[in-house]
């Protein structure tokens, strides 16, 4: 999906604003209540910024191994991982502690740079159950790609 799928103001915010402001802009655009951005560092995902994530969860997600939880799976697969309802999910994709967030409709997408390198993972979530459309997943991937260029 072309970057034009995101409003110009959001694209500019993603490129230049402090990361917390950029993440909040993504949450606002997709009508989400919580989010995270992890960067790849030494083969694992390191938390860079989180918004509206309970402190006990933040302490658990400071470092996420590739392949663990939905962020780690998005990194491993290099594709979006979504859950309609994190609270009732029994697929094994989410870590049990993720339920503490109180979020339901969750989406994690890889942040891939223009040279194809995995730079991190952008995660967003809604407080209610939600099925993410392919177009929405692609738009969040665009947002993550812009973040990866920072």
Language model: regions and residue ranges:
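Regulatory loop-to-helix N-cap segments in sensory/regulatory domains
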Residues: 125-143, 150
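Signal-transmission linkers at sensory-effector interfaces
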Residues: 1-17, 119
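Regulatory sensory and allosteric helical modules in signal-transduction proteins
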Residues: 40, 44, 56-89
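Flexible loop/coil segments at beta-strand boundaries within sensory signal-transduction domains
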Residues: 112-118, 127
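Signal-transducing coupling segments at domain and membrane junctions
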Residues: 55-57, 84-105
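Helix-loop-beta substructure at the N-terminus of cytosolic sensory domains
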Residues: 11-48, 58
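Amphipathic alpha-helical regulatory segments at dimerization interfaces
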Residues: 8-13, 20-29, 73, 77, ...
